[in-house]
């Protein structure tokens, strides 16, 4: 009877202590930063023959470096303003170089909201909002402008580099974790004589898998992917990265939703187990009592 009383007390305690589930909602996914290929005024005189785009992901951020091979296809000196969209210029991490030499640049800021869109103003690409005014909840995107000077027939490498914040849920430590990268390639439609595009994607151990992308990447190394083409894609670059299967499984058990579900289901399950144990004990006692009565 002592075992019966103990099991009964445990079952009653678990029943009384059963938690009331608390609703929890995931925050909206984080919007990715905005980055773009370069555009320039003298597209009639300068050709971009090659772009090498390196995207190196570390945690919830990426370092984007774009190298452009540009040639003055005229027999006269050419000077032109150049621009591209980039985030995070305020921390001084943006770099612009011409054949390895740093160039000075200026920045204009635009408000970025859910209804923002990329539009052209002559040769320029700018991010605009419906009313042109920033609200408290809006992010800012920067338009970087710099000057290039080319001698007749000169070929040079222009390189731009900046940090980039991933969209999605890159900071989560459970199975909702994922990252989104978006990069505007459409400004490159203004280029001429284009011959080669290479996109190198370097992922880290936290999100080592490409879940989906607008271009077909090929795996060329550990967490390293590459896309090459002799033409520009017809759409902007979008990349969705995620955890692998093992990480997803571990992340499932880290999820607050999973823990809440277990907390809700575990007490009833234990009560059922306790009742089964009680029933087994009672049946054993009944059987034992019957055996004694036959003696």
Model feature map: region roles:
Residues 23-83:
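Early extracytoplasmic/domain-onset interaction patches
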Residues 133-135, 142-152, 165-169, 174-259:
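Intrinsically disordered, low-complexity linkers and stems that provide flexible hinges
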Residues 49-53, 64-66, 80-82, 94, ...:
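Hydrophobic residues positioned within well-ordered beta-strands of beta-sheet architectures
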Residues 250-295:
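C-terminal single-pass membrane-anchor helix
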Residues 1-8:
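Bacterial N-terminal signal peptides that target proteins for export
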Residues 111-140, 150-152:
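Extended, solvent-exposed segments with strong compositional bias
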Residues 9-18:
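Bacterial N-terminal signal peptides
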Residues 83-119, 190-213:
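Solvent-exposed beta-hairpin/edge-strand motifs
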């Amino acid at each position: 009877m002592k075992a019966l009383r103990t099991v009964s007390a445990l079952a009653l305690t678990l029943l009384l202590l059963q938690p009331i589930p608390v609703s929890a909602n995931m925050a909206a996914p984080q919007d990715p930063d905005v980055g773009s290929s370069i555009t320039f005024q003298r597209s009639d005189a300068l050709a971009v023959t090659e772009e090498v785009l390196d995207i190196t992901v570390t945690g919830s951020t990426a370092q984007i470096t774009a190298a452009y091979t540009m040639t003055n296809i005229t027999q006269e000196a050419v000077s032109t303003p150049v621009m591209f969209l980039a985030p995070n210029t305020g921390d001084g991490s943006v770099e612009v170089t011409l054949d390895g030499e740093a160039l000075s640049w200026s920045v204009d800021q635009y408000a970025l909201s859910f209804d923002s869109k990329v539009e052209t103003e002559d040769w320029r690409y700018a991010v605009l909002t419906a009313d042109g005014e920033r609200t408290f909840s809006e992010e800012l995107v920067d338009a970087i402008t710099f000057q290039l000077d080319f001698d007749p027939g000169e070929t040079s490498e222009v390189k731009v580099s900046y940090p980039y914040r991933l969209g999605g849920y890159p900071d989560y430590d459970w199975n909702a974790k994922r990252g989104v990268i978006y990069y505007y390639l459409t400004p490159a439609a203004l280029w001429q004589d284009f011959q080669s595009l290479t996109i190198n994607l370097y992922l880290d151990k936290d999100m080592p898998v490409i879940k989906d992308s607008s271009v077909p990447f090929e795996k060329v190394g550990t967490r390293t992917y590459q896309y090459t083409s002799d033409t520009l894609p017809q759409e902007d670059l979008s990349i969705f990265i995620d955890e692998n299967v093992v990480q997803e499984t571990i992340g499932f058990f880290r999820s607050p939703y999973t823990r809440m579900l277990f907390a809700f289901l575990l007490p009833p399950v234990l009560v059922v187990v306790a009742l089964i144990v009680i029933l087994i004990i009672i049946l054993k006692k009944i059987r034992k009592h019957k055996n004694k009565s036959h003696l």
